[in-house]
Curated annotation (Swiss-Prot):
Membrane topology: Multi-pass membrane protein
Name of encoding gene: flhA
Protein name as catalogued: Flagellar biosynthesis protein FlhA
One term under GO cellular component: plasma membrane
PANTHER family: FLAGELLAR BIOSYNTHESIS PROTEIN FLHA-RELATED, FLAGELLAR EXPORT PROTEIN, MEMBRANE FLHA SUBUNIT-RELATED
Record family assignment: Belongs to the FHIPEP (flagella/HR/invasion proteins export pore) family.
Length: 692
């Protein structure tokens, strides 16, 4: 009993919004019941009338809608109205076949009116009218609207990344706020979803038109069989009775279908403005009196041709002339807008400001349009998250936060191409193919794979772009397999490390100093700028980063500078002193946990020769420089084969000279001095440069 009372109270507890939520399920239940349950003729009249009214409402809403997204529910409504018409066809077919022998009113007054009054009771005329309506709906309106929806969906989807990037650019420039950006992104997504849905929903209408023809044929044939075989009617009376009912049923269904198809065409062909379709049509068709005059002249000439219906043509000629005269008079009576006062020519152009100066980003990336989904968080792009992780990991490893990577699309690039820029200059580029995998050969992979051969952009190893299905096979053969976003992120990470010294500017030096001052205020207060200038500190830190030395241990760096800067102001000399102070960290960086360090060494005779050249102030002889470079390259190759770090150990005085000389040709080589190695490590020479 309590449950019954609760059910009776349910309608009073539902709010208007809750009734709106139930509208969809109620309509589905109604459609299903129409297909399953036999309905009386009066209920069919109500449902046919409701279908006609609904189609007219949909058309009027489409006409008065100013923007496509104002009627975003149209694809769903199109589906429901199609199902409603098909359900009505099923219900009316059932009652026509069951009660058609009783007379013209067997399927209700609406079907009778459409079958008798609209076509004069002549079933041949009814069949012709029905077929014409189906052809208009199927071949003209629906086909055209479907094609427009297909092309519109394609263009909307192609333009979606550009719109997203434009919104991000406006947001970054401060032209819009975060809420407005979210609203615009939502509208762009809704527009793409709408046209994509319309592309598919148009197929429902075409299928409905085909179903209407088949249902008519089935009704006529079935009616003849039922009337003749079951009810003993003659073939002529059965054909007349059942065919007229079928024609009425078909017309009462096809006319709303034609109206709905017209509404679909209006929706997909309209242009989003501040005017509805009627205002656009009237305003643009009848705005020019010259057009009316020319049209009147053409009709007047046709009206004077012998044998033509002169009265009709001349009536329309007079109407168009009157319309042109009225439009011309309205233009002449329109109040003239006050003309703005013209400023002198030299003041008419807005003066340039400093806001017009575009500064280059410290670090940027440009991508082709195929790579835009990788950097769009709304499309689950992983690259943005990877870049954030790269910056965080780099800050933890090297001791400073690299600049933000500004990403933008560049339609001049190849679709799968990307470029990495530093201060507006390209420092790296490559190709990436979303959905495919890069199989990198580390030198030990066996066999080959089908795909596009390329080179790993970060380390220059041979690689192949393969399909996802070949991923496991590539791993079995010894390839290192990574996805497209990982390729780009690894390349970016490699370049940030390679150019870390250039990315560390005075601004970053000051920010790092401010961060250190929070922990050690007394040290920084006494040191900068009293003992060492910010310029000198910046140069020392840059020198360390240029040789891959982390600057995390700022306490040691600042204390060393505080001790030696009063005696030495040369940044390169101060860098050498700081490197010795950071010796344990440098040793740990290249030889973690190894008591024995395997390094490349210099022959004693070559070392003496280099020291003499350094003390004499002269440069290296060209022949000696070439031999030194060639032997270093050979030793480095042997070092890599042993799996040892690419480290060259030299005399402390020679380290800066050899580092600058060899780093140009062998950027992977690390030059350490004997003073920078920890005392508790045992040194083993794997190769000697300059030896016999």
């Amino acid at each position: 009993m309590a449950n019954l009372v609760a059910m009776l109270r349910l309608p009073s507890n539902l709010k208007s919004t809750q009734w709106q939520i139930l509208a969809g399920p109620i309509l589905i239940l109604l459609i299903l019941s129409m297909m399953v349950l036999p309905l009386p003729a009066f209920i069919l009249d109500l449902l046919f009338t409701f279908n006609i009214a609904l189609s007219i409402m949909v058309l009027l809403v489409a006409m008065f809608t100013q923007r496509t997204l104002d009627f975003a529910a149209f694809p769903t409504i199109l589906l429901f109205t199609t199902l409603l018409r098909l359900a009505l066809n099923v219900a009316s077919t059932r009652i026509i076949l069951m009660e058609g022998h009783t007379g013209a009113a067997a399927a209700g007054k609406v079907v009778e009116a459409f079958g008798h009054f609209l076509v004069g009771g002549n079933f041949a005329i009814g069949i012709v009218v029905f077929i014409i309506l189906v052809i208009i709906n199927f071949m003209v309106i629906t086909k055209g609207a479907g094609r427009i929806a297909e092309v519109g969906a394609r263009f909307v989807l192609d333009g979606m990344p550009g719109k997203q990037m434009a919104i991000d650019a406006d947001l970054n420039a401060g032209l819009i706020g975060e809420d407005e950006a979210k609203k615009r992104r939502s509208e762009v997504t809704q527009e793409a979803d709408f046209y994509g849905s319309m592309d598919g929903a148009s197929k429902f209408v075409r299928g409905d038109a085909i179903a209407g023809i088949l249902i008519m044929v089935i009704n006529v044939v079935g009616g003849l069989l039922v009337g003749v075989l079951q009810h003993g009617m003659s073939i002529g009376s059965a054909a007349e009775s059942y065919t007229l009912l079928t024609i009425g049923d078909g017309l009462v269904a096809q006319i709303p279908a034609l109206v709905i198809s017209t509404a679909a065409g209006v929706i997909v062909t309209r242009v989003s403005t501040d005017q509805d379709v009627g205002e656009q049509m009237v305003g643009q068709l009848f705005s020019n009196p010259r057009v009316m005059l020319l049209a009147a002249a053409v009709l007047g000439l046709l009206g004077m041709v012998p044998g033509m219906p002169n009265l009709v043509f001349l009536l329309f000629t007079a109407a168009l002339l009157g319309l042109a005269w009225w439009l011309r008079g309205r233009e002449e009576k329109a109040p003239e807008e006050p003309q703005p006062v013209k400023m002198p020519e030299n003041n008419s152009v807005v003066e340039a400001t400093w806001n017009d100066v575009q500064l280059e980003d410290s670090l940027g990336m440009e991508v082709g349009y195929r790579l835009i989904p990788m950097v769009d968080f709304q499309q689950d792009g992983e690259l943005l998250g990877r870049i954030r992780s790269i910056r965080k990991k780099f800050a933890q490893d090297m001791g400073f936060l690299p600049p933000v990577v500004h990403i933008r699309d560049n339609m001049d690039l190849q679709p799968a191409r990307y470029r990495i820029l530093m201060k507006g200059v390209e420092i790296g580029s490559g190709d990436a193919y979303p959905g495919r995998w890069l199989a990198i050969n580390p030198g030990t992979a066996a066999g080959t794979l089908p795909g596009e051969k390329t080179v790993d952009p970060a380390f220059g190893l041979d690689a192949i772009w393969i399909e996802s299905a070949l991923k496991e096979q590539a791993q079995i053969q010894g390839f290192t397999v990574v996805e497209a976003s990982t390729v780009v992120a690894t390349h970016l990470n490699h370049l940030i490390g390679q150019f870390s010294a250039e990315l560390f500017g005075r601004q970053e030096a000051q920010q790092l100093l401010d961060r250190v001052s929070q922990e050690m205020p007394k040290l920084t207060e006494d040191l900068v700028p009293g003992v060492v200038t910010l310029t000198t500190l910046h140069k020392v830190l840059q020198n360390l980063l240029a040789e891959k030395v982390p600057i995390r241990d700022m306490r040691t760096i600042l204390e060393t500078l505080a001790e030696h800067a009063p005696l030495q102001s040369d940044p390169h000399e101060l860098t050498a002193v700081v490197r010795v102070a950071l010796g344990r960290a440098i040793t740990q960086q290249w030889f973690p946990g190894n008591e024995e360090v395997q390094v490349i060494g210099l022959d004693t005779a070559l070392e003496r020769l280099l020291l003499q050249a350094l003390q004499g102030g002269g440069g290296l002889e060209p022949g000696l420089a070439d031999r030194l470079l060639a032997q270093t390259q050979e030793a480095l190759s042997r070092q890599e084969m042993l799996g040892a770090p690419p480290v060259l150990l030299v005399n402390h005085a020679l380290r800066p000279l050899l580092s600058r000389f060899l780093r140009r040709s062998l950027p992977q080589l690390v030059v350490l001095s004997n003073l920078e190695l920890s005392d508790n490590r045992h040194i083993r020479m794997t190769a000697t440069i300059g030896g016999k």
